[in-house]
Amino acid sequence: MTKTKNTGGALEALVRKRLPDYKAEGLALEQNSPRFAGKVGPRGKAQGRLVSKGGLDFSGHFWGRAVTFDCKSTEGKSFPLNERNVKPHQARRLREAHEMGAIAFFLVEFSELAEGPRYFVLDWPVLAPYWEAVDRARNVGGKAPASIPLDVFKRSCTAIVRDKGGLDLVAVIAGMAEKMEVKR
């Protein structure tokens, strides 16, 4: 059984550690801010609650190309496709961004792996057949994959190595941008 926790909060922190470096190098990724809903109470005090953000964890630009991604973390040897882990609006946003020419992906951590790479870039072309099966099953019935096995990540996704400064996504994003240019 594959368990999920905060689905990526600690991973977000690793990425955030590198944001000042990206900015200093002329690369900027901005984290989406959560939205508040509520009203102004007596004496002008805001009363409200935090509502979930509508987009993905990070968005911005890399050398003139739009980039958007969401951080996910899982225990075990597969990436669950349940709604707790991947919300339909997140997959939709990833697909739409990809179709518009953006670099769009899930940054997935396999938190319990003892050896080998544990961070992978799951881009839309790899995710699409799995997510479309989940979406089809949700809408018209049928069987859908419950998760994407680790072997698929090792075979089809780019691995990222963690260093002292966190996770460096620059080389990965540059490689994805190059591949996209070749396909045009």
Name each model-derived stretch.
Residues 1-49, 183-184:
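Acidic-basic catalytic patches of nuclease active cores, encompassing PD-(D/E)XK
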Residues 51-56, 61, 95:
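Basic/aromatic recognition patch in beta-strand/loop cores that engages polyanionic ligands
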Residues 95-129:
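Nucleic-acid nuclease catalytic cores
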Residues 117-149:
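Short, electropositive alpha-helical surface patch
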Residues 36-40, 76-79, 113-115:
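Short, solvent-exposed loop/turn segments at secondary-structure junctions
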